[in-house]
Amino acid sequence: MAGTVASPEGITNPPIDDLLTAADSKYALVIYAAKRARQINAYYSQLGEGLLEYVGPLVETHVQEKALSVAMREINEGLLTSEPIEQQ
């Protein structure tokens, strides 16, 4: 098809440089986003059971969008906060 170019989503949108403002390092960003993605997946899993233990997506989602992409967009929009865990 002439004139149509797929715009990449997921890890390329939002850009990594924008996401790194919310975390101390790339590793911390990965852990942060992965934990939130697991919460989003758990939210969708619990809907069928009638439980409301987890918080659902805070941004508008698309049907085929992965939980990690949703988590990255939430982080980029500043809807989540991260606190460092104190080592004992």
From Swiss-Prot:
Record-annotated disulphide pairs: none
Signal peptide: none
GO biological process, any: DNA-templated transcription
Keyword line: DNA-directed RNA polymerase, Nucleotidyltransferase, Transcription, Transferase
Gene3D superfamilies cross-referenced by the UniProt entry: 3.90.940.10
GO cellular component: DNA-directed RNA polymerase complex
Catalytic activity: RNA(n) + a ribonucleoside 5'-triphosphate = RNA(n+1) + diphosphate
E.C. number(s) listed in UniProt: 2.7.7.6
Single Gene Ontology MF annotation: DNA-directed RNA polymerase activity
Function of the protein: Promotes RNA polymerase assembly. Latches the N- and C-terminal regions of the beta' subunit thereby facilitating its interaction with the beta and alpha subunits.
PANTHER family: DNA-DIRECTED RNA POLYMERASE SUBUNIT OMEGA
UniProt similarity note: Belongs to the RNA polymerase subunit omega family.
Record note on quaternary structure: The RNAP catalytic core consists of 2 alpha, 1 beta, 1 beta' and 1 omega subunit. When a sigma factor is associated with the core the holoenzyme is formed, which can initiate transcription.
Annotated protein name in UniProt: DNA-directed RNA polymerase subunit omega
The species this protein was found in: Kineococcus radiotolerans (strain ATCC BAA-149 / DSM 14245 / SRS30216)
Gene responsible for this protein: rpoZ
